[in-house]
Amino acid sequence: MHKLACPKCHESIVQEGNSYKCANNHCYDLAKTKYLNLLLNPDKATNNPGDSKESLVARKAYLTKGYYDVILKSVIDCIKKYRDDTPLDILDLGCGEGYYTRGLKEIFSLDTIYGLDISKEAINMATKYTKDVYWLVGNSKNLPIVDHSLDFITALFTVINQDELKRTLKKGGYIIHVTANPNHLIEIKELIYDEIKVKSDKYIRLDFETIESYDLVHQVKIDNREDALNLLKMTPHYYHIKKERRGVLDELERLDITIDIKITIYQTSID
């Protein structure tokens, strides 16, 4: 049984044909591609929130080549380590075009997986991977999930709202938080910027019990121009390139990059 909730009243919603309804008769229609739009207009900052189509297409093309599989495997290993034998409800928060979500479903095929992103374009792309995931357009500040119903929330390089994590996770539920360390994709920063500004991670730490935290460093060799440009386009750095530096892209034939991330597992209180 899914744990979907109405974003207006947070009551459970049930499927009736091609729609989902709550007890207060709020109704949401399934899209033709089988995703559910649970994003309310007040939750939108723009008419088309989220990443651009160019960025999403580049992201899908790059990730499906397996360059970031080491990250997916690490998240999967974390879930395997901390799960029990009961069926799980797992939300992939800010799932984008669905690559990691699809990977979770392939491994945890008997569990219920949700992929949520604020971008309708991203979720529509995600449905092409599989229809066995609950693909949701929604806002991390107003998760369309019933209270205290999730076993795991995965959050990879995405904005989160701690109050919503507390509300939707079960007692003893887990958050797998993946964040970029200062040297993540350092080669791209050196390519684009005259000066690299190192950001502190002091605001990234969440207000939950830390169960485990470790750094993952991995070298990746990209030996063709197309994949290198796709990596650039899926990062915000590409859109910050100064005009006088754009010439470096014309000469880009290959790229060696460093994956340098922090994986932190948090747990909510069991009391």
Which residue ranges define each predicted feature?
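Conserved beta-strand signature within the Rossmann-like core of class I S-adenosyl-L-methionine
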Residues: 172-182
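N-terminal auxiliary segments of SAM/dcSAM-dependent transferases
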Residues: 1-48
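A short acidic, Gly/Pro-enriched loop at the edge of an enzyme's catalytic core
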Residues: 141-152
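Conserved SAM-binding loop of SAM-dependent methyltransferases across substrates and taxa
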Residues: 97-109
